[in-house]
A protein has these predicted regions:
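Metabolite-binding pocket within alpha/beta catalytic cores that recognizes anionic/polar moieties
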Residues: 1-147
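Non-catalytic positions within long, well-ordered alpha-helices that form the structural scaffold/packing
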Residues: 99-102, 193, 212
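His/Asp/Glu-rich mid-to-C-terminal helical/loop segments that flank catalytic regions of hydrolases
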Residues: 229-267
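Zn-dependent metallopeptidase/amidohydrolase metal-coordination segment
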Residues: 202-240
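Active-site/ligand-binding-proximal alpha/beta "capping" segment
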Residues: 162-198
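Short acidic/polar active-site loop segments enriched in Thr and Asp
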Residues: 104-105, 198, 217
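Generic non-transmembrane alpha-helical segments
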Residues: 11, 15, 154, 158-168, ...
């Protein structure tokens, strides 16, 4: 990151005369959801002074600002991961940018692996708590974090109602953050399951922490795109993750649209 946050915010505001109340971070293979934004103004990351570029397939690298069902929104298509070599400051930069743009509600989406056989690929899961399985801070056994400032009960309620309204099966569970970029071993998946995890992925928790510190209301929804290692015998590929996310895209998009339409009910 070479530019100042103030410069980045000023540039985005100069490109789009929108003061978004809600931000959505789109995970692997979910970038097409930005097409639902009405009057969407696209701001490529490469145009923002000093803003980094994502390197992972399925992350296009642009902000989309506009309206969705009457709610002013900004969507980020493309995120940054520690395994790409970025530091935490860069990984959480979009969250800080959203905050400076006036965002109050943050919806994080991701593609994750299912650690439980009953949650098959294509399952949508609202995250009620998280585990830090990276061991970056210490070697203690990870603990489940379910504080409301990281996982808004109000937004989880709206997500559940939106799923019911649209006849979408939305599970709830605990997301385990692993460092990546290699997929986890069967032994690691067994431990995550024992610790109470339901899904595992390589992103999102740094964003949850940053947004929580900034006072945003946070909702995280995972698309379980594959079984994690050892749950079934088939190997895992990134291509499978992107394909599964695309297949679930219609349901996911419908759910997100409904959530955003009703998100003002928590304010």
């Amino acid at each position: 990151m070479t530019g100042s946050l103030e410069t980045m915010v000023s540039y985005v505001k100069s490109r789009a005369n929108v003061s978004p109340a809600t931000a959505v971070v789109l995970g692997s293979g979910l970038g097409h959801m930005a097409e639902n934004v009405e009057g969407g103004i696209k701001v490529p990351y490469g145009d923002i002074p000093g803003y980094p570029q994502p390197t992972v397939e399925g992350h296009s690298g642009e902000l989309i600002l506009g309206n969705l069902r009457g709610e002013k929104v900004v969507m980020a298509s493309g995120r940054f991961h520690l395994y790409e070599g970025w530091d935490l400051e860069t990984v959480t930069l979009p969250i800080k940018l959203f905050h400076e743009l006036g965002v109050k509600n943050l919806i994080l989406t991701n593609s994750a692996g299912s650690v439980r056989v009953q949650n098959s690929p294509g399952t949508l899961m609202a995250i009620t708590a998280h585990l830090d399985f990276t061991y970056q801070e210490n070697s203690d056994t990870p603990l489940i974090v379910n504080e409301d400032r990281y996982h808004s009960a109000g937004l989880l309620h709206i997500a559940g109602e939106s799923a019911e309204r649209n006849n979408i099966d939305l599970k709830e569970g605990v997301y385990a953050w692993a460092l990546g970029p290699s997929y986890e071993t069967p032994a690691e998946i067994d431990l995550i399951r024992e610790l109470g995890g339901h899904a595992v992925g390589m992103s999102t928790v740094p964003e949850i922490r940053a947004a929580g510190e900034l006072g945003m209301k946070i909702l995280t929804i995972s698309c379980l795109t594959n079984y994690a290692a050892g749950v079934v015998e088939a190997p895992i590929t990134h291509e499978e993750v992107i394909a599964s996310a695309a297949e679930a895209g219609e349901r996911f998009g419908k759910l997100l649209t409904s959530i955003i339409e009703h998100i003002g009910e928590t304010e």
